[in-house]
A protein has these predicted regions:
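Alpha-helix N-cap/helix-initiation sites
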Residues: 21-24, 132
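Winged-helix-like regulatory helical subdomains adjacent to P-loop NTPase cores
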Residues: 23-119
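A short, terminal or domain-edge coil/loop segment
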Residues: 20, 54-58, 210-218
């Protein structure tokens, strides 16, 4: 009933599961058994009204947090796309830039089924000032977390595998990656969860967050709200900068791997 009446919930399950029935069932099971879901309230609502429509934010919270009170990536359906490997503030957005490039119709396709060559991806990211080591590390993580997939269907789970075989020749974004890019990163619940797992390299901002004066008064929000606003502004600024640099008449930005 919830899937029939809540299109956003249906979109979430289909895209996060990648169309895999087993993963979809796991998402539902995780929601039903999550300590972050108010089960008593749901049972009471069903008792009083005879039905309960699961809201997207409630279902997504269970997928984000699982059995924990704070985000733990290895046990979550979500990936922290703002994580870094090196102490570089710009790197917070490297995973998003890779996802954005792989979903861009203007990128040179290596194959007819949406794969983009590794060379094109690395060249594009290097034009933004990122090193091959940074780019490779993020590609490896995005592949392991199934936000992108390689033409060779390798998960790149170990550094030894990369040393022995190198990176695959081409990649494309998955529905899970597209959902992160086009939906999750603009939602407060996702950004709030990631704020506990994302280092802050800006000394001024870190001092401001740590200052008691920052949060005095009822009009001040949770510290993660400031990080949320900062991430949203920075992400949109980077996206617009990239879009402007590529802009041409008739250009499109829809993706074959976009959300359903």
């Amino acid at each position: 009933d919830s899937l029939a009446r809540n299109r956003d919930l249906y979109e979430f399950i289909v895209n996060v599961s990648g169309g895999n029935v087993r993963v979809a069932v796991e998402l539902v099971s995780r929601y039903l058994g999550s300590p972050n879901v108010e089960s008593e309230r749901i049972v009471q609502t069903i008792t009083e009204t005879g039905s309960y429509v699961v809201p997207l934010h409630e279902f997504a919270k269970a997928a984000l947090l699982g059995d924990y009170s704070h985000f733990q990536e290895e046990s979550s359906a979500a990936t922290n796309v703002f994580s870094v490997v090196y102490r570089d503030r710009r790197e917070h957005f490297l995973s998003l830039l890779i996802l954005g490039f792989l979903s861009w119709e203007g990128a040179t396709r290596a194959q007819a089924d949406g794969f983009i060559s590794l060379h094109s991806t690395i060249s594009e990211m290097q034009s933004g000032g990122f090193s091959p080591e940074q780019i490779s590390a993020h590609i490896q993580k995005l592949t392991r977390r199934k936000l992108i997939e390689s033409s060779e269907r390798r998960l790149l789970e170990t550094g030894q595998e990369i040393l022995e075989s190198g990176l695959p020749d081409s990649f494309r974004i998955t529905t899970l990656g597209a959902y992160h890019l086009k939906r999750w990163v603009s939602e407060f619940s996702y950004l709030e969860s990631m704020s506990f797992d994302t280092p802050i390299f800006d000394d001024r901002l870190r001092e401001e967050l740590n200052s008691p004066r920052t949060w005095q008064g009822s009009d001040k929000a949770h510290p993660s709200s400031m990080l949320t606003a900062l991430v949203l502004r920075s992400t949109k600024a980077l996206a617009w900068k990239k879009a402007a640099s590529r802009a041409s008449p008739g250009a499109t930005s829809d993706s074959k791997g976009g959300t359903m």
